């Protein structure tokens, strides 16, 4: 018992020194990897390939002057979103449709939702040509409004697209050249076996 008391007395100063209250505890720090601090901001990489050159525009029919695009034309009043332009708009092209409204009225957007067209000229940017056609057909059928749309390239070049000769395709236009037109019935085509392996179609002969 006395030996145990002497041993504890001999080692008490060591324990006191090791657990001295004067020694301030050091706060533990946790080094977090950069991936745990939150997602890193994403930036769109610049395209490696240069923007393709615009294809040569077809000559306009004689007597028709394509209308010029005015970039200062106001857009319709729309509180929603058209979904933005596609990625290809930065490296290829996007489309612009214009029309002139006799009054301020509500119309349906091809991307969903309703917007208010302004009285006078309107301009709307869309990502696809099919969206311009859908909106244009609606403007002509319901509102009796003529429209035009254009293709805009990344370098700023504007190409007039539709209606190509100033008259919509479903209308007759004197002097318009037919494409793939054959003035005969399908029963008067040659037999397909006669043109097999020739690289031609029965309606081409």
UniProtKB/Swiss-Prot annotation:
Renumbered residue ranges of the record's region Disordered: 18-66
Subcellular location: Plastid, Chloroplast thylakoid membrane
Start-end of Pro residues biased regions: 49-59
Topological relation to the membrane, as annotated: Peripheral membrane protein
Chief place of localization: plastid
GO biological process: photosynthesis
Gene Ontology, cellular component aspect: chloroplast thylakoid membrane; photosystem I reaction center
Family, per entry: Belongs to the PsaD family.
Name listed for the protein in its UniProt record: Photosystem I reaction center subunit II, chloroplastic
Naturally occurring in which organism (per UniProt): Hordeum vulgare (Barley)
Name of the gene this protein is made from: psaD
């Amino acid at each position: 018992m006395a030996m145990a008391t002497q041993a504890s007395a001999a080692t008490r100063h060591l324990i006191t020194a090791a657990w001295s209250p004067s020694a301030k505890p050091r706060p533990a720090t946790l080094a977090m990897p950069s991936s745990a601090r939150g997602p890193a901001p994403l930036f769109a990489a610049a395209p490696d390939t240069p923007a393709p050159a615009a294809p040569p525009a077809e000559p306009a029919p004689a007597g028709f002057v394509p209308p010029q695009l005015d970039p200062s034309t106001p857009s319709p009043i729309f509180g929603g979103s058209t979904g933005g332009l596609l990625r290809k708009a930065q490296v290829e092209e996007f489309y612009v449709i214009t029309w002139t409204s006799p009054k301020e009225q509500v119309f349906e957007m091809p991307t969903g939702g309703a917007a208010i067209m302004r009285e006078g000229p309107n301009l709307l940017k869309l990502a696809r040509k099919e969206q311009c056609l859908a909106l244009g057909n609606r403007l002509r059928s319901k509102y009796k409004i003529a429209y035009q749309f254009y293709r805009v390239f990344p370098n700023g070049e504007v190409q007039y697209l539709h209606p190509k000769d100033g008259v919509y395709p479903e209308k007759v236009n004197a002097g318009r050249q037919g494409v793939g037109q054959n003035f005969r019935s399908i029963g008067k085509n040659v037999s397909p076996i006669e043109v097999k392996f020739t690289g031609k179609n029965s309606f081409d002969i």
